[in-house]
Structure formats: C-alpha cells, structure tokens
Amino acid sequence: MPNVIEITDFAAPELDVYARLTQAQLRSRLEPEKGIFIAESPKVIARALDAGYQPISFLMERKQITGPASEVLARCGNAPVYTADRAMLAQLTGFELTRGVLCAMHRPLLPTVEEVCRNARRVAVLEGIVDSTNIGAIFRSAAALNMDAVLVTPSCCDPLCRRAVRVSMGTVFQVPWTQIGSTAADWPEQGMQQLHTLGFKTAAMALTDLSVSIDDAALAAEPKLAIVLGTEGDGLAHTTIAACDYTVRIPMSHGVDSLNVAAASAVAFWQLGKH
C-alpha cells in the first residue's frame, strides 16, 4: 500500500523540493551527489523508473492514488506520497500540475563523455541552448531519430529541469547523455579535441559561405559524426564553427534561412542519423 500523507502544513520541510527550492538548489542540493530533480506525470515517472532512477517522494492529487498513478506507486515501495486536492496543490507549488502527479527523484552522477560515446556513431552536441522547452524537444527528437547520445555544454539548460523532462516526455531518460566540459572555458577547444580523439568528425549546423547541404554524401559516409547545434537566436559561436570539420546547412524554401533549433535538430537527426 502507498505511504499516503495528507498535507496539513504548507511549511513542512519535506515539501521544500516541490514548493520552495529553486532549480539550481535542487540540482546541487548542497552537494552534487545529493541532487534532486522533479519528474511530472505517470508516463514520465514510469520512464524514469524504467531507466533505474530512484524516487524520493511523490506529490499528487488524491484521485491519482487509485487512478493513473497507481501502477507507478506499486513500483515504489514505501516512498512518501503527499496528497491534497488540485487547488491546494496549485497553491503550494505555484502552478497547475500536469496530470496531477510530481515525483522527486535522486539525480545520478553524470557519466563521462567516453562512457556515453562508447559504441556511438551519431551524437548530438548542444551548445548554450538555454530554453528548457527546446532542450526537451531536442531530446525527444534525438531519442526518436537515431542519435546514440547527447552531449550538452556547461552553458546549456539542465536537461533534468522539470519543464525539459516534461517536454521530452521522459525520453531524456532513454537516450544516454552527459555534459562535455566541466566549465564554459573547456568548450569548444577542449571539447572538440575530446570528440576528435574519440574518432568523431564534427558537423556544425550553421549557414556560412562554406556550408554543405545536409544531404551531402560525405556526411552520410562518416562512420562517426557529432552534430553540433547552437543557442537560440545567435546560433553557434564562430570559434565552434571554425573548430568543426563540416559546416552544414538545411536547404529551405520561400526565402527562409533558419529554423528554430528544436525544429532544425529534428531535420538534422532524421537526415544524418540514417546509419
């Protein structure tokens, strides 16, 4: 039976993870090994459990306990289940709960780039992408369209922030990922060198005079390719483009010269992930 606890005190410290800690505080939780993230909705939580992530506690509407969340709860032993009606939960968290369920989970230590890229042939590299919706959408496309791994630079949005996890529909738990470089100063020079040492050719998604079409046969022939996508608005840094082996453009019509980075990633993964 679930360990159900009716909420009577909004100030209870065990509710801090849902109501009062910032994303940065959740991520560090004083020490990296104590980091926490929030998964939202039964389907997303189930995918996290499938991937081996460990639950800490739940926050949900009462009706969810015997409804859509029941299968997830059956997998989680005695994890505390804090509950109230929807209006009270919205007052506590400051937002409407999607499908009425949140789960605080332990954040694992990140694997190394070498571990994530072992046996990988196509990887996505995300530079400075700060919008959590874009991060979630890119991870969903990466999982669906044949990317073997995703690498994020230190300036990227956290892939395990609540909105990114929700938008990804939990696919952030299905595709291997890690951070490339410990600090922003490690990218692009050290990060690119690491990719080249691992045998990857690098392809910058950018529009320059030297860009080749995304359907260029040379790209498809590369045994190991890292597809590098840049921040919203400004795109990739000039130093990143210069460090890449290829600069790649997506042919477009009606005078359009660029796509949102999430849309561009889906096109790139579809075309370049056919291996």
For the regions a language model picked out, list residue spans one by one.
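Structured adenosyl-cofactor binding patch, chiefly the S-adenosyl-L-methionine
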Residues: 103, 141-145, 159-173, 238-275
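Anion (oxyanion) recognition and catalysis
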Residues: 49, 75, 196-197
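Short, aromatic/basic amphipathic alpha-helical patches
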Residues: 67-78, 240
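Boundary-proximal intrinsically disordered activation/regulatory segments immediately upstream
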Residues: 1-68, 156-157
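Active-site/ligand-binding-proximal alpha/beta "capping" segment
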Residues: 203-254
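RNA substrate-binding interface of SAM-dependent RNA methyltransferases
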Residues: 5, 106-210
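A glycine-rich helix N-cap at a beta->alpha junction
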Residues: 75-94, 178
